[in-house]
Amino acid sequence: SETAPAGVKVLDYTGKIITPGLVDLHLHAPQYSYCGTAMDLELLDWLQQYTYPEEAHYADPAYAKLGYAYFVRDLKNSATTRACIFATLHTDATLELMHQLRDAGLSAFVGKLGMDRNSPDSYREPDAAAGLAETRRWLDTCRAENTLHAGPVRPMITPRFTPSASDEYMKGLGELAAEYKVPAQSHLSENPSEIEWVAALCPGTKYYGESYSRYGLFGGDVPTVMAHC
């Protein structure tokens, strides 16, 4: 056996495994409460019947605080120490999640969702202008808290997916990503029904990814993570 140099603290981990913390590139924090359930529907129906109604509850600050507390607690107790996380479309709830992650000592990119179409009235922003104004408020708050480009928990521009964000909204999000110099995340090519839907919504595009790239949200100057593709 080797002897440690004088003054070096020795920690004995005999019988244990030391491993780097894992990185999860795609998490939906508000979906944690029903993880492993509601598996009876295909994606697009599943969103409408289960996901959007649950995420709409995060408009309530108390609900968001408690829901995210369970998520952050269990994430901290897992092997995942860094993640790219989707929150909801609610600015204040997204900030609550970011604060809880920071206080727990975790590292993450977190996204306030952009959604102004193809979801229930109870879970949709009024229009692109309103959504962009809230996104800017969120980014300005991050800047004021010195988390825009520094610290373990930072913002990430997040149109939920192309069917959820109008062309005007996507264009504005691309401009905000460039203006604030922050990365982006979304979904891409999750299943055949979604791919067909995007093709119908974006007839001028040749492939799904182009619905993002034409607005500067597909790599290049804006680092981008696309889930499920």
Task: Walk through the language-model features, giving the residues of each.
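Short N-terminal targeting/anchoring amphipathic segment
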Residues: D12, D24, C84-F86
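Short hydrophobic "helix-edge" motifs at membrane interfaces and signal-peptide entry regions
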Residues: G15-I17, A69, A177
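Short, function-defining helix-loop hinge/capping sites that tune catalysis or transport
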Residues: A29-G36, E168, I195
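Alpha-helical scaffold segments that flank or form the walls of functional sites
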Residues: C35-L106, G131-H149
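Metal-coordinating catalytic core of metallo-dependent amide/deamination hydrolases
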Residues: D92-C229
